[in-house]
Amino acid sequence: MAHACARGVVAPAPSRVSPRVSGRRVVVARVGTSSAEASAKEAPKKSEAKGANEVQFEAVIGIETHVQINSNTKAFCRCAAVYGAEPNRHTCPVCLGHPGTYPILNAAVVKKAIALGIGLDCSVIRRKSTFDRKQYFYPDLPKGYQISQFDEPYGEHGKLDVVIPVEDGGGVRTIGITRAHIEEDAGKLTHFPAKGNEPGYALADYNRAGVALVEIVSEPDLRTGREVAAYGAELRRLVRYLDVSDGNLSEGSMRCDVNVSVRPVGREAFGTKVEVKNMNSFNAMSRAVDFEIERQTTLIRDGRGDEIVQETRTWDEGRQRTVSMRKKEGLADYRYFPEPDLPPLVFDNAYVDGVKAEMPELPAAIRARYAALGLPDDAVQVLVEDKALVEYFDATIAAGAPAKQAANWLTGDIMAYLKNAKDVTISTMPLRSKDLAEFCSMIENGEISGKIGKDILPDLLVGETGGAGPRAIVEERGLSQISDPAEIEAIVDKVLEENPGQLEQYRGGKDKLKGFFVGKVLAASGGRANPALSNQILMKKLAGE
């Protein structure tokens, strides 16, 4: 059954407020919240220095991540799923919940959701899962309920390997994934505070309402803000590799709600869970979580633990603190019941195998492959961050480049250039992978020095070589490395002859002058002298041999 999108149709939010519609703007009257009361409560100051026998606390952290699937249309209707359009342009009776309309599941959403479940190594990918209605009243939810999966999510019992920051012990830790389920997004509210005698209000944009999401719920396996940021970054990396989502935090296509509680070290029972929302970068996520851990720990140490309540708090970037938004609903408050207008989602093993066959190599496998090449951990992390960079590096290796040389130049000088270049990416820069392979091989084989490499690389990067490759440029400019011992010895003799005072000081015990002579030899050769050979000859000459 097809449903034509009705441009400009906006449904009243079935909530405690009544929106008034003006064109495509939906104006929602401001409702009373705990934000004013909460903002008046400053976070408690840190307790005095800990006593020797004071109880130590640890944080217990789990994350609910909402990932927008980058399908062309919404989850259950044909409205376009695009970011940044005119407010309420992409709405229709289906996504606004008008009576008599029926949702139809987007097949592209299912395929990408299953790919993500496989990527998360879910041991359970249900061949039959069901949809439910999650009911709550808020102006951003025009239907008064959200189609989700509750009793039977499509994916469960997964895991994600996360590179843990050195400050938290380093290494790779496996973070459990409780479940992954398909649901639809809510609309977006933009709040405007009161001014003078004018009351505050909110504008509702329902373009986002009905956009397809996968919600990924982690186990409470994280302990610090840095770990939370590392988990979020790894999950974003995965969804980008799979082309499930662009994972753009600032645009809301990936949103992380972090559940934080603290407990005495060694205790099994969890503390009171507080949800922290509205963090639009991983750095902000780390700071928000660390603040919330400190807030809860301080309250408990000061005998005010009963002030920690199950609630939703927002991160206030300007004040660098979490602020209470509202009491956190429980499962009973959502009144889940089976979605009557959607049949179960059913697929067979052949469908799952087909999705798996189309999946690319994932970050964890690439890390293992690069580690086997002997690449250092920091270079591996830089390379794996960008799928396009991985493809370029692999093409460079396939063209014959020594792996370590290629990784060094890519993650160093080339990435520095791309960071500062305007409208240039690894995929569009003029330096072809085969030319980088030739460049790296020439340095590895001693045909040119690293210094000469740095001199010619900028021309290769910006394409000012007339299409000539590295070897042709070196030959044209006479930059080949000097590896003839006799020629280098003559250069060294000339340098020593021109600097008798420094030579006398060196032989008198001023060893630091060695660098002076190395620089002079390098300059005299135009940067072409073989570094190892010239150093060997120089040391013999300095010793008077």
Curated annotation (Swiss-Prot):
SUPFAM superfamilies associated with the record: GatB/YqeY motif, Glutamine synthetase/guanido kinase
Gene Ontology BP annotations: glutaminyl-tRNAGln biosynthesis via transamidation; mitochondrial translation
Keyword Disulfide bond: no
GO CC terms in record: chloroplast; glutamyl-tRNA(Gln) amidotransferase complex; mitochondrion
Keywords associated with the record: ATP-binding, Chloroplast, Ligase, Mitochondrion, Nucleotide-binding, Plastid, Protein biosynthesis
Main location: mitochondrion
Broadest EC class assigned to this enzyme: ligase
Subcellular locations according to the entry: Mitochondrion; Plastid, Chloroplast
Its biological purpose: Allows the formation of correctly charged Gln-tRNA(Gln) through the transamidation of misacylated Glu-tRNA(Gln) in chloroplasts and mitochondria. The reaction takes place in the presence of glutamine and ATP through an activated gamma-phospho-Glu-tRNA(Gln).
Family, as annotated: Belongs to the GatB/GatE family. GatB subfamily.
Extra information: This protein may be expected to contain an N-terminal transit peptide but none has been predicted.
Matches recorded under PANTHER family: GLUTAMYL-TRNA GLN AMIDOTRANSFERASE SUBUNIT B MITOCHONDRIAL AND PROKARYOTIC PET112-RELATED (PTHR11659), GLUTAMYL-TRNA(GLN) AMIDOTRANSFERASE SUBUNIT B, MITOCHONDRIAL (PTHR11659:SF0)
Name of the protein in its database record: Glutamyl-tRNA(Gln) amidotransferase subunit B-1, chloroplastic/mitochondrial
